[in-house]
Swiss-Prot record:
Membrane topology: Multi-pass membrane protein
Subcellular location: Mitochondrion inner membrane
Cited PANTHER family: CYTOCHROME B
One GO term describing the cellular component: mitochondrial inner membrane
Cofactor: record remark: Binds 2 heme b groups non-covalently.
Additional notes on this entry: Heme 1 (or BL or b562) is low-potential and absorbs at about 562 nm, and heme 2 (or BH or b566) is high-potential and absorbs at about 566 nm.
Cofactor annotation: heme b
Function per UniProt: Component of the ubiquinol-cytochrome c reductase complex (complex III or cytochrome b-c1 complex) that is part of the mitochondrial respiratory chain. The b-c1 complex mediates electron transfer from ubiquinol to cytochrome c. Contributes to the generation of a proton gradient across the mitochondrial membrane that is then used for ATP synthesis.
Secretion signal, residue range per the UniProt entry: none
Residues reported in the UniProt entry to bind heme b b562: H83, H182
Originating species: Saiga tatarica (Saiga antelope)
UniProt name for this protein: Cytochrome b
Membrane spanning residue stretches: 33-53, 77-98, 113-133, 178-198, 226-246, 288-308, 320-340, 347-367
A single BP term in Gene Ontology: mitochondrial electron transport, ubiquinol to cytochrome c
Amino acid sequence: MINIRKTHPLMKIVNNAFIDLPAPSNISSWWNFGSLLGICLILQILTGLFLAMHYTADTATAFHSVTHICRDVNYGWIIRYMHANGASMFFICLFMHVGRGLYYGSYTFLETWNIGVILLFATMATAFMGYVLPWGQMSFWGATVITNLLSAIPYIGTDLVEWIWGGFSVDKATLTRFFAFHFILPFIIAALAMVHLLFLHETGSNNPTGIPSDSDKIPFHPYYTIKDILGALLLILILMLLVLFSPDLLGDPDNYTPANPLNTPPHIKPEWYFLFAYAILRSIPNKLGGVLALVLSILILVLMPLLHTSKQRSMMFRPISQCLFWVLVADLLTLTWIGGQPVEYPYITIGQLASIMYFLLILVLMPVASTIENNLLKWK
């Protein structure tokens, strides 16, 4: 009898993607983050769905509906904090996943990589809009500051901002549309993730060496399914430790104050996972320049395949590039720290230096290091 999983039209797709998929025999735990991102997305959609059942997207009642969820809804508090901290876990996995791609040269799979960059943008947009929904002080002022950046676009900027706001300031119309977009975007992300996987399975996975592994493949199940389950258990453990012991650790105390357009918080800052980009934005005195730098700090990932000058794909055997990669990681951590600090000396200077270093590393130093490594190996 022919196995049903290999013949049934639907089961066949699942089988080819998760069971009989030929996978390299040497992929490390850095390859776990793809499945962890899938779990994060499912978790966010499910918790978000239950939150949406009790939330009201109206400026008069939004803040109180979130309070109601936490106080009156059965297990509402755990759903709310799983959703809020789930977003943090999502971004930790995202940054690890992108970092893995940079380190091991996975960006040479062009379609997979570019869809990944679109996924990153979509996830950032979703998270930003989600942060606005509780309608606390930081929600309101974060939305005001970030949407206002679009006014830097020449000629159409002001009209564009008012169009997004649905009026002359962040108000009821803005909150309603942000809720609508925040609800629909995760499903678009899920669809894009499927396309991401589709293109990945056209080429097969990369591996730590960066050398083609067609001669040494193993089935995905049971080897990597069990490995992914371990990763998932660790992810859920860390998430639940965060949710049950310090649910507000990564949040902002200002968001426990209802939004007040007449009172500006002393330090307006986004969630921690946007701080690196926010620091780059703030480090440039010109508004349009700052906005361009902000967009380019993420869009620069699209250029990675063009900036790859090495004859080797992975950084596994390239010590100079490895050092620069970890300098880049340290630089991003510095930017994250600076983004949360007030705009004053010495933070301004550190932020400017870290921003220059970020673009310099990616655009100049890493390609030059790769060329030097080629010459050292006499691979001209």
